[in-house]
C-alpha cells in the first residue's frame, strides 16, 4: 500500500506482529509485539535485556551484517538528507565486539523519603522509565555493577 511502519528490532523480510502507537503524515511508528517469521539473519542477542534497554539496537544481527547495515544507513542518509549519491567506504570492524564501550550513561530517579531512587538505563522508546541493568555486555568491566 506504500505506507511505511517503523518497527524497531525487526529485520528486512521478517513478518511481525506490531502495535502502532503513532501515526504521522507519511508513516507510523510501532512497537514489536512478536516475530512471526524471523529473518535468516536474526541471532539470539547476547544481552537478556535487548529490546527493553534502549542502549543497543543491533544485537539481533550478526556483526558482519551490522557493519553492512551501518554502511548502508550512511549512504541512505547522505542521499536523503544531503542529496549526495556516493559509494561509502565499508564500516571498519572493531577488534572488540563486547566490553568496548568506555562511557555509559545510567539515569536515576530522584530520591524520595530519604531512599535512593532507581538507577539504570532508559527503557527503549521511553524518556522516564528505567531498566535495571546489572551487567552490560558492551560496557567495559569497570562500568558495570556500579550502584
Kindly give the residue locations of the regions a language model identified.
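Accessory RNA-recognition modules of RNA-modification enzymes
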Residues: 1-147
Amino acid at each position: 500500500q506504500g505506507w511505511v511502519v517503523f518497527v524497531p528490532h525487526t529485520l528486512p523480510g521478517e513478518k511481525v506482529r506490531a502495535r502502532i502507537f503513532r501515526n504521522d503524515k507519511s508513516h507510523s511508528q510501532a512497537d514489536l509485539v512478536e516475530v512471526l517469521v524471523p529473518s535468516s539473519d536474526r541471532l539470539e542477542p547476547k544481552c537478556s535485556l535487548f529490546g527493553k534497554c534502549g542502549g543497543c539496537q543491533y544485537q539481533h544481527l550478526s556483526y558482519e551484517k551490522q557493519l553492512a547495515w551501518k554502511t548502508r544507513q550512511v549512504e541512505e542518509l547522505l542521499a536523503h538528507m544531503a542529496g549526495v549519491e556516493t559509494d561509502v567506504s565499508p564500516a571498519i570492524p572493531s577488534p572488540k565486539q563486547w566490553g568496548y564501550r568506555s562511557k555509559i550513561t545510567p539515569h536515576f530517579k530522584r530520591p524520595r523519603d530519604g531512599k535512593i531512587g532507581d538507577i539504570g538505563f532508559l527503557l527503549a522508546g521511553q524518556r522516564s522509565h528505567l531498566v535495571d541493568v546489572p551487567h552490560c555486555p558492551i560496557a567495559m568491566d569497570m562500568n558495570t555493577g556500579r550502584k
